[in-house]
Amino acid sequence: MKGTCSPTSTSSGRSSTPAPPPAFDFQPLGRVVFGSGSLARLGEVARELGGTRVLLVTDPGLEAAGHPQRAVAAIEEAGLEAFVFDGVKENPTEREVAAGVVFARTHRVDLIAAVGGGSSMDCAKGVNFLLTNGGRMADYKGHGKATKPMLPSVGVPTTSGTGSEAQSYALITDERSHLKMACGDKQAAFRVSILDPEVTLSQPKLVSAVTGIDAVAHAVESFVCARRNPLSQTYSHAAFRQLEPNFERVMSHPTDLAARSAMLLGAHFAGMAIEAAMLGVCHSCANPLTAHYGVTHGVAVGVMLPHVVRFNAAAVGDLYADLAGSAGALADRVTAMLSAAGLPRTLKECGVSESILPLLAEEANQQWTARFNPREVSEADILGLYRAAW
């Protein structure tokens, strides 16, 4: 794997002394329990963390699959009490977080468990912030602003996408601006992540597709972002190697547990890479599309990623080559994955009006992940990316 300390070439063609690896400061966030059937260990894990009254944060759509019910059973079998808050919606706002806080206070919970996709994970972290530290989510925008101890928490992802269970940030949507606030603190990270591939078997094809593409985008963007380092790139590379060959397999054979396992593990690795590094302009471009048109996040990053890869090739083409042979091949591979999943490949297919592209570019340029893109990017550059994707 090529990294950030690869030898550089001189004008004579000879390799010069490799640049030293960049400095980084990374602390692993918590324990990872991986394996089929591991959801059954939720109660055991919660008890080990000292929990007695567990807030289970989930969304009502999972009830048909039985995941919240199995989580409650595992908690109760460990001799603990479970209180289910299922008021989570996609892209949670402070309204859902506030409702969760009221519910948590009413039941005097001492541990939080999230079972669901990224929205459940984000909402659970948001509840933890406000339940223990008070205030509003905007008070915690950025990193490290919690001043009081937070509750121990456990994350059980039911999708192979966000990798939120591996990150210390809660992404909560501002209801006024419709933009996402990234609120981070090491205390907000889950003490334990339980990765059970069996719970991902119930995902509908569309959910598998959009979350899987999101995970791929996480792996690709974190691998080349300005804050990349040898540790984060190890996670990014491992994530891509799990995700890329198994995405289409899951699309065509949704009950293939081996492929599902690889996707879940790959999404988690990508989440670890984000925590150790950052993302880039692809995610900056995606958020306004969701805010204005309700474009699902995975669709938005999928449409934008091939164009971002081609744009960044001048700066990090050698790194893209490490993933797929060349930047062009990587961009084409992402497009092929979108086609295999039946997802849109253009903004026009997503219903985006060409006339709004300048406004989208203005808003995307204000998103903080754009600052970590490996190639410096301006509002005009972002408009060019949107036009290319339209």
Named regions from a protein language model:
Residues 63-135, 249-260:
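N-terminal small/polar loop signature for handling phosphorylated ligands or for N-terminal nucleophile
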Residues 1-49:
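N-terminal amphipathic/basic leader segments beginning at the initiator methionine
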Residues 354-390:
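Short, amphipathic C-terminal "tail helix"
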Residues 40, 132-228, 315, 319-322:
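A glycine/threonine-rich phosphate-anchoring loop and its flanking beta-alpha core
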Residues 289-356:
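Gly/Pro-rich interdomain helix-loop hinge
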Residues 235-285:
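Oxyanion-binding "anion nests"
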